């Protein structure tokens, strides 16, 4: 595949050394370099771009295959890698420590249960192709459970755990969350590959902030699809950035894989497409405008001319956003109208039939496209083997593009088209395998994979699950992410004042996600990570100058009081030498003082941030009333109930899981997963099994547990009396911050007085600050703590003495 890469192989040290020198010509300088305006170009980078074109024009048959030779890492590489490996290890420990301690959330139990079903399906996969035996069900993609990615890979974790001899035959609360913790750790590692854009210190800071972020840690210990999507989104960012920088095909393939996996994870990928696609359009508009001079068209002696931009680039971007803004307005209005239409009971059948026709057309066309694409790639591989690959050359529109000032257009117009085909093939294979459930449901998987997710997402805009106000994330994120919020704002300011394309992209990504997720009907705490992730990278950009200045000062101070040999050794072969050059001009005392104050402020803000992370991830992970981020969570009472069920089964059947259990419909989740080893469970009890009598155990849930008590525990016509035990299945955070129209009192009064403000009370800043402070350090709830969903355990009287009360 060498001839497709279009770049010679570089070792990591060489790549690090070369990349910072020509960053602005690609997407902007590293953060340690002196920033310039986005219209300026670096003339001495022409040789780098020209070398790229020389590689493009080489004949494939003239290339000499190069073999990678193993060589031990250099001191410079070690000094670069060790700090990153240290913070990645920190992130892994925070994510894997006590991973299975918390009971499974309602949604986690669904994901765990159907992943286990998929694992069992793979043992009899032919039954899922042909009509299965009566009573045998196969997992198929349904957007109600979101994308198929997590079910395939959690099932894979189950299988690996079984092979390794993990407890409970490899299926337990820990193995359910291993995938989330693994990809959450991967998020911590990914900024390492953005060193050319963030600088080494900036990249390390991004890794560290992601490692200790309360939201990133908590939801990396939570088997929901959002942490997977966040990983794949950041993987796309890394892949695109690295591809524009190196032109190596593997990075474009990684980008395509990241997109395909994200699409196979959650429908919110549509929002990612909106943000990334609109920024791509703005960047293309900017680069198109760069070729048209503006200032030079006017009289240079006029004082007004000096205020004009050099080119039409700002004008084209303004025009682009004006058009895009109007288009977005109509798009959102269309989405709303379509959502209302398809959820109207009078239109449901017509909407379903229309979507089914779209699926049928897609199923007829997409496989043919996939086969043709695969055949084309096979031809390319054959020609590669024969040494007859045609390498892309600069021709046509590419001749009119300035590689330095228009790197994106240059990338698009001069890249080998083989890169696109391999990337598309990679995405197509991932889509087909996951949505067809490993080729067991090809027709349904293709049609549903293309249309059903979008259809479901449009329907959910009217459901508005959670009914949260527009300011939900503006309350939630500052409560937990103190260092991220403060330095994220500083990062935005720095990115605007000292812009590079990558910095502006991060700002656009953060602001775009904040707006879109606040606009979307469904607002949940797990969605906050799509906002906090770019915010934390911006926080690294905001904090980096102060850290660099302080490290520089300490190194220079050490060198002043060291021998010349020690001072030379301090700077020689330094993995961060490019960010702390020996010839760097002295920084003024005032600037140094400001930098030290900035670092001190960062440490002070880090304290509540880390404290919040510790509290939500390890102290109150199953305590909804005391953690806004937890929102609603299964309580540890579920473990208590299961311990009693297991004890009864041990008493009656020697632990063979043969006991009959009645499970009412309101208690199905999470108990469908917790009772997975009990084959004699009657779901939707008692209507689900009218012939069952004298059931040893009944588990019920609902808003009226006392009605269940009357039915099974105290009814005079019930000869088989049951012992009644009341527990809490789920608890939740108080929602008094909602506006009065949706049952709250508003955020100001709620923060000031809780749920019961005095008559004619107004927002009180002092009381609000006091309540937030008490919540930060004592976890004293702001509102009511009694919100709960009850459950009832009934044990037949003749067995009640077999277990402890």
Regions flagged by a language model, labelled:
Residues 2-558, 606:
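Membrane-integral, polyisoprenol-dependent glycosyltransferases
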Residues 152, 485, 670-674, 707:
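Phosphate- and divalent-cation-binding pockets in alpha/beta enzyme and binding domains
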Residues 496, 511, 543-615:
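Signature aromatic-anchored transmembrane alpha helix within multi-pass, membrane-resident enzymes
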Residues 452, 456-460, 584-585, 589-660, ...:
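Membrane-proximal, lumen/periplasm-facing interface regions of secretory-pathway glyco-
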Residues 433, 689-784:
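Periplasmic/luminal catalytic loop of GT-C fold multi-pass membrane glycosyltransferases
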Residues 365, 675-691:
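A short, well-structured beta->alpha microelement
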Residues 216, 514, 667-668, 687-688, ...:
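Solvent-exposed loop/turn segments at secondary-structure junctions
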